[in-house]
């Protein structure tokens, strides 16, 4: 059964705090610090699709930073899994554990059969507003980084009339 999407383009992304690959509490808003953010959700399993999404984001990390964005990844895996993936792939960004799928549910990505619908990418502007989202229905629905870069290059400022943080 699929749950409805709770976050959409134009809405403020809900903040959350989860454990990172080193078992430290990381808050999305604290990490973001008023910068743009590429927020990625992947399954907590070590398969070809998860590795592909991780490697895409790692390979273009410097390009994301050039455009003023950080990267944060949320998985349904535990801290130990995330530590292994983080170390094996030498990731320059944090992997957060949402093993109970609380945040995955909050973002409308939960599927009771697989825990996560498919890989998902949310791009947040500097005010924390979602300016782009891509939610895969299958594990192989992996977002191309070029599309993310185009979003970051474009106007991702807060829409007029949106409350300041």
Feature annotation, model-predicted:
Residues 1-165:
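Chalcogenol-based redox active-site neighborhoods
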